[in-house]
From Swiss-Prot:
Residues 1-282 form the Protein kinase domain. Keywords: ATP-binding, Early protein, Host nucleus, Nucleotide-binding. It comes from Monkeypox virus. The keyword Chaperone does not apply. It is found in: Host nucleus. ATP binds at residues 1, 30. Pseudokinase that plays a role in viral DNA replication repression by activating the antiviral protein BANF1 and inhibiting the activity of host VRK1, a cellular modulator of BANF1. GO terms for molecular function: ATP binding; protein kinase activity. PANTHER family: CASEIN KINASE-RELATED. Belongs to the protein kinase superfamily. Ser/Thr protein kinase family. Poxviruses subfamily. This is Pseudokinase OPG198. Both catalytically active kinases B1/VPK1 and host VRK2 repress B12 inhibitory activity in a B1/VPK1 deletion mutant strain. Interacts with B1/VPK1. Interacts with host VRK1. Interacts with host VRK2.
Length: 282
């Protein structure tokens, strides 16, 4: 008879643990609910209790990504869904803590323009919601944007940032330790500033460029060269797109999106509707 490793979450639900999906700062395991099914439809993210990012992520799921709040927000705006995973379990042992979400599929790699436009709208909707709750995601990059059954999901809420202090938008200060993939990092983050709303949207823009078939010209460069190029390209957007799309096939919607995002001040509220309309197809 086959033996299984298993654990219980804080609600007493039993989870059967499968193979490792990823091992880094945290570990991801395939998990399933019962012994009769052979499909591992869920993912467990587990780490030592001393690892603060996972604790922050769990707290963010509980306090900010509340299903009732999300449902009310989307219903008021006539939005089908946000790219936010549902939380299925939280648990802890003496030394470790974990949470469980659905297996959300693979990294989004679009095969047609329609799926790109839909993903852009969904991601703008999702960031607008997160920002409306007083936070930024802080780590928008392709590895954190997944797709399964044509549904986009944004994962990894371990680097979220509070936008307000005592009701006032945080000041721009270059006093943070940077983290994340330098290719998609916003300029503010490169310089040590907390990611604000414009930073989330800037990082999404770099993802969009690749989704539309372009390339980021600073890939494979050192971190110093990457930030230098990004700062220069913000001043010369036409040159930026010439280098991203050498064949001259850059979508005008994407160019306008980047222009609008680059014009935002650090504490400015973006015009999400204007950004969204760029990618809504009739």
């Amino acid at each position: 008879m086959e033996s299984f490793k298993y654990c219980f979450d804080n609600d007493g639900k039993k989870w059967i643990i499968g193979n490792t999906l990823y091992s880094g700062n945290s570990i991801l395991y395939k998990v399933r609910k019962n012994f009769t099914s052979s499909f591992y439809n869920y993912v467990m993210k587990i780490d030592h209790k001393s690892h603060k990012p996972l604790l922050s992520e769990i707290r963010f799921y509980i306090s900010v990504l509340d299903p009732l709040t999300i449902n009310n927000w989307t219903r008021e705006r006539g939005i089908k869904y946000l790219a936010i995973p549902d939380l299925y379990g939280i648990g802890e042992t003496d030394d470790y803590m974990f949470f469980i979400i659905k297996n959300l599929g693979r990294v989004f790699a679009p095969k047609d323009s329609e799926s790109v436009f839909e993903a852009c709208v969904t991601m703008i909707n999702t960031l607008e919601f997160i920002h409306s709750q007083g936070f930024t995601h802080g780590k928008i990059e392709p590895m954190n944007i997944l797709i399964r059954n044509k549904r986009i999901s944004l994962i990894d809420y371990s680097r979220t940032n509070k936008l307000y202090k005592s009701g006032t938008h945080i000041d721009y200060n270059e006093d943070m330790i940077t983290s994340g993939n330098i290719n998609y990092m916003c300029v503010d983050n490169h310089l040590g500033a907390t990611v604000s709303r414009r930073g989330d949207l800037e990082m999404l823009g770099y993802c969009m460029i690749e989704w539309f078939g372009g390339k980021l010209p600073w890939k494979n460069e050192s971190s110093i060269k990457v930030i230098k190029q990004k700062k220069e390209y913000k001043q010369f957007i036409a040159t930026f797109f010439e280098d991203c799309f050498p064949e001259g096939n850059e979508p005008l919607e994407l160019v306008r999106y980047i222009e609008l995002v680059y014009m935002l001040d650090y504490s400015q509220t973006p015009n999400y509707d204007r950004l969204r309309r760029l990618f809504i197809q009739d």
